[in-house]
């Protein structure tokens, strides 16, 4: 396939906001490509040349891209800069100035050159990147060049989510979505949809079924449902394991021989940030190859007390790492093991995995297996919960004893119960920032005064609004919000956002913030869970807690289903309170 043909598909996707239409366009594209192209096209759809967990970036600013364009288009850079200020999209400048109507490269040739650009480093690499990009611009159709520069700048933003791509992969093969569960299972245990698609194209459904957990490929993390009372845990699980819920970084640690990689909840490779944990893993799992999960939390070495998340988050940085190791040492509380010495053990029941974890770890001062109790007694669970709260922890997690580890799935195999506050919802809500409103009055000087936030509809692969928030952040945080959001601002509403509200500035759905609210109410202006009566669901008196949660991505946000579940639980609690007061 020629890159210009792929660009035509990008154009079609960009022009639609309908999920099914987007899926059909993708399915038509996938039908036309071979096993060598499918992997590369999946990555390019995401604006990348590798899976998300690989830190491969193009490393080219707008200034460098303009240099490459000036070189390729033979237009003075001053003229390009002047027009760019008017149109705001370097891709449109390619359309305006390119004379390459008869030229093109294949998708594979274009991808391979982009991969070279991303991997260039060291002395002379800047000029080499500019020259290679200029070669590509000069070799592609105007439309191809338009999408090329958007990819390089991280501004492709087609609004295509992984669920839509998985549906399209199935549809391309069997004209329905029946193969989606097999594709999703493979994706959940590899976090690499390009690789999964390539295996599928090479060997069909049987090859997909043979994909196994592999050290170095992060597994999409299992997630817990939430309840507001101990009794609900016993009702759903009966006899179960109860573990503490720590307020730190959830980590998935991969060790093979002397190589260690540490992935965050949203599958970022954070290995370099935690040299103390790497050292501990090599010591405490010295003769084993493992994938374990746990929660890393900073603590006061003099008192043994755990620091709150706002302190722990300071360990997540690129610079002065050794200084942070000394200031805020970490402990890791391991709660699961998914792979051991060549064996994928995700299918084993929780109780067996727990046993293998305890057997695999050696004693040390950094990594511990989380304590737990096994019971079906609500009083015993309540006592354990209160003990955790007293220790400064978030709450507890209950786990079904016979449950396998279900990668990427949120269900009632795991149930979390967090500390609640009088007049608040029993749990916070993780929302995605969709846009912002310019400040008025005192906040006019910041240029930002409120956020439009939403939750994720995982059935329709859309973000839906749930609140407009103007309280919580400090003045310094408002300034930081403006800075980070302006880096991802958009000219119009993204295709994967459903909203009745128009903020002053739309942004790419990328950053997650934690929201505390008093309750959930029905709303005529928000689209979360919107029903035939025109009413959706909204957070009442929402407040932002802290700044952006860098350990969470947009698809880790609270879902529409969870909001509806919280609303039903809230109504049930009110009925019970009213009956208690009779």
Curated annotation (Swiss-Prot):
| E.C. code | 6.5.1.1
Keywords from the named record: ATP-binding, Cell cycle, Cell division, DNA damage, DNA recombination, DNA repair, DNA replication, Ligase, Magnesium, Metal-binding, Nucleotide-binding
What InterPro entries does the entry give? ATP-dep_DNA_ligase (IPR050191), DNA_ligae_ATP-dep_bac/arc (IPR022865), DNA_ligase_ATP-dep (IPR000977), DNA_ligase_ATP-dep_C (IPR012309), DNA_ligase_ATP-dep_cent (IPR012310), DNA_ligase_ATP-dep_CS (IPR016059), DNA_ligase_ATP-dep_N (IPR012308), DNA_ligase_N_sf (IPR036599)
Q: Under which name does UniProt file this protein?
A: Probable DNA ligase
Question: What role does it play?
Answer: DNA ligase that seals nicks in double-stranded DNA during DNA replication, DNA recombination and DNA repair.
Q: Tell me the Gene Ontology biological-process terms attached to this UniProt entry.
A: cell division; DNA biosynthetic process; DNA recombination; DNA repair; lagging strand elongation
Recall the GO molecular function terms of this protein's record.
Answer: ATP binding; DNA binding; DNA ligase (ATP) activity; metal ion binding
Q: Give the encoding gene's name.
A: lig
The UniProt annotation places ATP binding at: 243, 250, 265, 295, 335, 410, 416
CDD domains under this entry? Adenylation_DNA_ligase_Arch_LigB, OBF_DNA_ligase
| UniProt-listed PANTHER family | DNA LIGASE 1, DNA LIGASE 1/3 FAMILY MEMBER
């Amino acid at each position: 396939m020629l890159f210009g043909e792929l660009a035509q598909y990008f154009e079609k996707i960009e022009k639609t906001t309908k999920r099914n239409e987007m899926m059909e366009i993708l399915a038509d594209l996938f039908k036309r490509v071979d096993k060598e192209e499918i992997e590369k096209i999946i990555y390019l759809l995401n604006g990348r040349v590798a899976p998300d967990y690989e830190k491969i970036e193009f490393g080219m600013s707008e200034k460098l891209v303009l240099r490459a364009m000036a070189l390729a288009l033979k237009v003075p850079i001053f003229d390009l800069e002047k027009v760019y200020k008017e149109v705001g999209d370097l891709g449109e400048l390619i359309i305006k100035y390119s004379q390459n109507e008869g030229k093109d490269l294949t998708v594979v040739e274009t991808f391979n050159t982009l991969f070279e650009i991303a991997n260039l480093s060291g002395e002379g690499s800047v000029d080499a990147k500019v020259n290679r990009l200029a070669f590509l611009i000069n070799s592609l159709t105007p439309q191809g060049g338009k999408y090329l520069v958007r990819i390089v700048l991280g501004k492709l933003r087609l609004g295509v989510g992984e669920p839509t791509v998985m549906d399209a992969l199935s549809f391309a093969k069997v004209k329905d979505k029946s193969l989606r569960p097999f594709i999703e299972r493979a994706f959940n245990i590899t976090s690499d949809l390009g690789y999964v698609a390539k295996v599928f194209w090479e060997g069909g459904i049987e090859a997909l079924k043979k994909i196994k957990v592999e050290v170095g490929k992060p597994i999409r993390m299992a997630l817990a449902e939430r309840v507001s009372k101990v009794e609900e845990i016993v009702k759903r699980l009966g006899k179960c394991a109860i573990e503490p819920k720590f307020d730190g970084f959830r980590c998935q640690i991969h060790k093979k021989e002397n190589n260690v990689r540490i992935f965050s909840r949203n599958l970022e490779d954070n290995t370099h940030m935690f040299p103390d944990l790497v050292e501990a893993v090599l010591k405490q799992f010295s003769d084993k190859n493992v994938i374990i999960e746990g929660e890393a939390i900073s603590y006061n070495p003099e008192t043994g007390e755990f620091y709150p998340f706002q302190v722990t988050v300071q360990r997540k940085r690129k610079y002065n790492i050794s200084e942070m190791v000394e200031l805020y040492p970490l402990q890791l509380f391991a709660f699961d093991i998914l792979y051991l010495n060549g064996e994928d053990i995700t299918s084993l029941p929780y109780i067996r995995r727990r046993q293998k974890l305890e057997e695999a770890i050696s004693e040390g001062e950094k990594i511990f297996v989380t304590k737990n109790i096994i019971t079906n007694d609500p009083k015993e669970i309540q006592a354990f919960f209160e003990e955790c709260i007293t220790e400064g922890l978030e709450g507890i997690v209950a786990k079904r004893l016979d449950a396998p580890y279900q990668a990427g799935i949120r269900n009632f195999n795991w149930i979390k119960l967090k500390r609640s506050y009088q007049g608040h919802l029993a749990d916070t809500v993780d929302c995605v920032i969709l846009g912002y409103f310019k400040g008025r009055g005192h906040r006019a000087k910041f240029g930002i005064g409120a956020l439009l936030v939403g939750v994720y509809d995982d059935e329709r692969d859309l973000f839906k609004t749930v609140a407009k928030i103007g309280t919580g952040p400090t003045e310094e945080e408002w300034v930081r919000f403006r800075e980070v959001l302006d880096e991802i601002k958009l000219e119009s509403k993204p295709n994967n956002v459903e909203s009745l509200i128009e903020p002053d500035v739309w942004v790419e759905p990328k950053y997650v913030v934690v929201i505390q609210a008093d309750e959930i109410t029905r709303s005529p202006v928000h689209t979360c869970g919107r029903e035939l009566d025109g009413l959706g669901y909204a957070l009442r008196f929402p407040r932002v807690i802290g700044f952006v949660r860098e350990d969470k991505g947009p698809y880790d946000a609270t879902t529409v289903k969870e909001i509806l579940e919280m609303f039903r639980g809230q109504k049930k609690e009110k009925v019970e309170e009213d009956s208690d007061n009779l």
